[in-house]
């Protein structure tokens, strides 16, 4: 949800050009939400030192607790990118307000360098054989679920009719 909120902030700023809102509210929100992504992921040797975010639930809540959900990783990267954009924009508009925010949030150059490293090295699952980006690391290993075999009265609220562990193992 953090990245979705950050995306809404950035979209609002892009559409309205409301620089005062950027200075008064948005920059701080974008920075703090970006920090979440820098805390929850890691550079994984097993993924060529790409930045991975594991044990997340993306927008497909029927596939919960997965590694490197494509949507989550993409939105996390964009959240961090938006935070860096906001800081640059704020500094160019009102350096005093920028300096106050940097002090308030205790932002250091090392943190921004780390964010840049994340942006440039975010991991996205890719299936070489099919030439597609699956929704997460394990998606292609899951068994296809033949929806035509689900009775109509059981299609809604799958968790009421099927155990979550059964649902999680399906495509």
Report each predicted region and the residues it spans:
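Aromatic-rich carbohydrate-recognition surfaces in CAZymes
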Residues: 1-42, 72-73, 80-87
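Short, solvent-exposed segments of well-ordered alpha helices
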Residues: 24, 67, 166-167
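Conserved alpha/beta enzyme-core scaffolds, especially Rossmann-like or related mixed alpha/beta domains
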Residues: 26, 55-56, 94
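Flexible glycine/proline-rich, aromatic-decorated loop/lid segments
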Residues: 41-57
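Acidic/His metal-coordination segments adjacent to aromatic residues that form catalytic metal sites
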Residues: 53-68
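A conserved active-site cap/scaffold subdomain adjacent to cofactor or substrate pockets
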Residues: 72-96, 100, 116
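Active-site core of glycosidic bond-cleaving carbohydrate-active enzymes
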Residues: 81, 100-171
């Amino acid at each position: 949800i953090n990245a979705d909120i950050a995306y809404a902030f950035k979209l609002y700023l892009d559409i309205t050009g409301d620089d005062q809102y950027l200075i008064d509210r948005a920059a701080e929100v974008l920075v703090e939400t970006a920090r979440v992504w820098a805390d929850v992921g890691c550079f994984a040797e097993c993924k060529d030192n790409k930045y991975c975010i594991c044990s997340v639930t993306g927008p497909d809540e029927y596939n919960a607790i997965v590694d490197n959900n494509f949507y989550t990783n993409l939105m996390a990267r964009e959240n961090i990118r938006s935070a860096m954009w906001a800081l640059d924009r704020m500094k160019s508009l009102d350096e005093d307000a920028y300096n106050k925010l940097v002090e308030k949030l205790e932002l250091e150059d090392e943190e921004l360098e780390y964010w840049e490293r994340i942006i440039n090295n975010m991991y996205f699952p890719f299936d070489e054989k099919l030439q597609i980006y699956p929704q997460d690391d394990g998606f292609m290993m899951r068994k296809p679920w033949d929806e035509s075999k689900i009775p109509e009265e059981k299609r809604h609220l799958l968790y009421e009719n099927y155990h979550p562990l059964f649902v999680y193992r399906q495509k």
